[in-house]
């Protein structure tokens, strides 16, 4: 009995020592180190008018974003951005075609080149003209309003600010190239293939009456000279004549005209060096619209830039005021009229990566 108790004491002593050892080891175990980790975050969305587009967060791997820009959009390496989050374009080129609904162009075998561009670059598939007929849309694209004009009047001049005046004030160069226009600053109203209502710049008083500005509205023949000499201005507007813009001639004629012109633009330093080319139509053939102001039909619109998205189709709603807003915002210009409306969305998604 005593021997048994003695053995039991040794067992109890052993268990006690084992317990103390375990507690000591647990007490000495260091806490794991805290390692900072970067967790992927969901970018916030910004709603503007009828368009909800993601605002991408800036990345250290991309071009540095100005510190004052708190709503930046990621763009391709090599491209700087403005306070709006848009690329700071070196050159902006716009070509305006005529009088076709988007459905008349998309998939049309008579427009193979435009459809090829849509596959290779970016298309705004829900983009609308503002009104009917042509002239109000040209004014909307350049002045941010139709200014109460509802016809293709030839002498209904406008005393209003406009993109050309803004560019000149900001020290940027600009030129409007008008096919079949007989000479710079031509104030006549109509020729066989030229119509002034497709030339919005001649409607603005501060351009038409100022030789320094008016002489920047030139015949299209000057474009090839400037392109080959690498002297294109910062802002380029191109209006084809009334046949090549599809107004009076077949879609295939306008498509062929673009097939000759656009590759020359895309091969130029002006486009390759931070450039962007927009191709749109002044109006469609329906009353469809979006974004509070537009009711001029859905029109085929392309965004072509070496820093833009490729093979991209946007279903967000845009209109001519959106395009003007995008141009002005990319160069930190004041927003004209309805281009500054809260219901006018910015076309920044085409350059986000």
How does the language model describe each region?
Residues 2-11:
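Bacterial N-terminal signal peptides that target proteins for export
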Residues 19-21:
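C-terminal motif of bacterial Sec signal peptides marking the signal peptidase cleavage site
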Residues 23-40, 44-56, 60-353:
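N-terminal pro-sequences and low-complexity stem/linker regions of secreted or lumenal proteins
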